[in-house]
A protein has these predicted regions:
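Outer-membrane beta-barrel signature, preferentially recognizing the C-terminal barrel domain
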Residues: 7-9, 205, 209-221, 267, ...
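Transmembrane beta-barrel wall of Gram-negative outer-membrane proteins
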Residues: 1-40, 44-61, 65-88, 95, ...
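Outer-membrane beta-barrel proteins
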Residues: 1-15, 56-77, 133-147, 215, ...
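Transmembrane beta-strands of outer-membrane beta-barrel pores
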Residues: 10, 20-22, 31-35, 84, ...
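Gram-negative outer-membrane beta-barrel transporters
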Residues: 163, 342-488
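Repeated loop/turn-to-beta-strand initiation elements of outer-membrane beta-barrel proteins
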Residues: 22-25, 87-90, 158-161, 235-238, ...
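Outer-membrane beta-barrel transmembrane domain signature of Gram-negative proteins
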Residues: 65-77, 83-87, 96, 105-237, ...
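C-terminal beta-signal and adjacent terminal beta-strands/loops
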Residues: 422-423, 478-485, 506-578
Length: 578
């Protein structure tokens, strides 16, 4: 099963507000529930390590494991805001949100349990095939946050001030799966096989998380900010801001911003900004761990994704995760060519230090200290989240708008937008004694650097038009995605493509609006993948004989597709306002 997952979704949004005293009480509730089903790789019956007495696999014809995910998003907000007569205002609010995903693997089997039933319990072939479970709960994850915000704005002379504070709690939980989903039944605690044949443990396709990888973590954050805007002269506007954040996990950080806007003439303005920034390690990067079956270089191995604060990470000498730090510079100009036509051009540079990435699978033979640590953890390889790279991004944004065009008796506005961006990794480092002898490209290499540098087009250009007449509106957009390159089993560059979107709507006087729209109406798809062996594949019988060969297992790259590979999408709909 190749392509998008089968999906069913329900979404509800409620907004409300009412006058209360001198201000407004407001709030919203959102809920989204989605059930997805996707396929893993097909398991052929040969070579499972779980052949029964009749010589056949426990699942005679093989199977396609299915990954089922139940996704729930829920959030609500309650706030109160007041605007005062002296041009000041305050807003206080509470927000809660959570996202949870429960994974179940179905149409699958834990091969090692077949060996347990066969050699450990002495069941017959028929009894084993009747009793082996084909489904298991793999694990659940939930990410949540709750915040209390206070914002106050006022004017002091010619200076506009904004002050604010926030209290936030982040939570993250991992719920262990059913024992059947993760357990290796035919291996002892020392990792040695206990039966005449040995099979992979855990349910095939999407193995579960054991209790040792379960998590229930939280952190608290307190933040303050101040923002000031000063009209220095009629032509020069100056803005400055400072923000302080204190995390109970890794400490505090202070960041700044300075921006200015200079009107050189009535039709020409210059603008620029300089700022520092940060991104704290996400809860997932800090606390996710799992031992699973992965394919490294086409070979199936047992490997682990270990927490950055795990015993193995400490044995290797991997430092605790810290925040990413950034420096941002921008300089631009706005030209009003006429009352109907303007052009804006902005250049920018973003440098990010200590960027967090997940390492390659680090196995035996790379360093003595790493070998010893892997042996102690009972793993053949390990991946870790590391502050391991620095990056530099340079780019330019161009936006031009031409409005008030008379077309078919209506008004039309045309917008041209272009973005040119290049990102380079300027440094790869490990900060670990055990990893120091290992070449950087083996710590973070292969296709992973290309994810940051080349997987997305360096240029995107769009030309769109918005037209309206009486109750009719129409929108058409041409979007050009530039070339991009992926690394799979070798580099492949995919050509530029132009996509066309169209939407037409009509609004009735009673609040009812109907629309018809098409996305990618000319059914454009990316170039087909040519350099990956995963493009083709064979299906074998239990005897190891080839039953069928398919040249197009993956027709399109499964690594990157900036505009997808589903082609045209059409829809009609209606909205009603009351």
């Amino acid at each position: 099963r190749i392509g998008d997952a089968d999906s069913e979704q329900l979404a509800i949004v409620v907004n409300a507000g009412m006058a209360l005293g001198e201000g407004e009480l407001y709030g919203f509730i959102t809920y989204s529930g989605r059930d997805n089903t996707s396929g893993a790789f097909y398991r052929n019956p040969a070579g499972s390590g779980a052949a029964l007495d009749d010589g056949e696999n426990v699942v005679v014809d093989g199977f396609l494991p299915l990954i089922n995910s139940e996704i729930d998003d829920f959030s609500y907000n309650l706030g109160y805001r007041v605007d005062f007569d002296d041009n000041s205002a305050f807003d206080v609010s509470y927000t809660y949100g959570r996202n949870s995903i429960d994974y179940t693997t179905s149409n699958s089997a834990n091969y090692s349990f077949a060996n347990e039933l066969n050699f450990g319990q002495g069941l017959t072939d028929a009894e084993i095939r009747a009793q082996i479970p084909r489904e298991a709960f793999a694990y659940g994850i939930e990410l949540g946050l709750q915040t209390i915000n206070f914002d106050y704005t006022t004017s002091v002379g010619d200076i506009f001030l904004a002050l604010g504070a926030e209290l936030r709690e982040d939570t993250y939980t991992i719920t262990a799966g059913d024992e059947y989903s993760y357990r290796d039944y035919d291996t002892d605690e020392a990792g040695q096989g206990i039966y005449p044949q040995n099979a992979s443990g855990g349910i095939q396709g999407f193995p579960g998380v054991s209790p040792s990888s379960a998590a229930d973590e939280s952190r608290n954050v307190i933040s303050f900010y101040a923002d000031a805007e000063y009209q220095v002269t009629d032509a020069f506007l100056l803005n400055g801001a400072i923000r302080y954040d204190d995390y109970d996990g890794f400490g505090d950080t202070t960041n700044f911003k300075l921006a200015g806007n200079l009107r050189v003439t009535d039709n020409f303005r210059l603008r620029g900004a300089a700022s520092t920034g940060f991104r704290a390690p996400s809860m997932q990067q800090l606390y996710f761990s799992n031992i699973s079956t992965q394919f490294i270089g086409g070979v199936q191995v047992e490997t682990g994704t270990f927490r950055n604060d795990s015993q193995l990470a400490r044995a290797i000498g991997i430092p605790e995760l810290k925040e990413e730090e950034s420096t941002n510079l921008s300089l631009g100009a706005v030209v009003d060519i006429s009352d109907r036509w303007n052009i804006a051009v902005d250049f920018y540079k973003i440098e990010i230090d200590d960027r967090i990435v997940i390492s390659n699978n680090l196995g035996f033979g790379l360093s003595d200290a790493l070998d010893a640590a892997l042996i102690s953890a009972g793993a053949s390889g390990g991946q870790f989240f590391l502050n391991a790279i620095d990056t530099e991004t340079d780019g330019v944004d161009i936006v031009s708008t031409f409005g008030d065009i008379n077309v078919l008796g209506g008004d039309m506005t045309v917008t041209f937008a272009a973005n040119f961006t290049n990102t380079d990794i300027t440094r790869i480092f490990s900060n670990s004694p055990a990893l120091a002898p290992i070449p950087p490209e083996q710590i973070f290499g292969g296709f992973q650097p290309s994810v940051i540098e080349t997987w997305q087009p360096e240029d995107r250009i769009s030309l769109s038009g918005n037209w309206s007449r009486d109750n009719w509106t129409a929108h058409v957009a041409l979007q050009r995605y530039g070339e991009y390159t992926t690394e799979d089993e070798g580099p492949q560059t995919y050509g530029a493509e132009i996509l066309t979107d169209l939407r037409v709507s009509y609004e009735f006087d009673n609040g009812l609006s109907v629309f018809a729209s098409g996305i990618n109406i000319f059914d454009v798809v990316p170039d087909e993948v040519t350099n990956s062996s995963s493009r083709g594949g064979s299906f074998e019988s239990a005897a190891g004989l080839e039953d069928m060969f398919s040249p197009t297992v993956f027709r399109y790259s499964r690594r990157s597709a900036p505009f997808g590979f589903n082609g045209a999408y059409w829809s009609v709909g209606a909205t009603f306002s009351f």
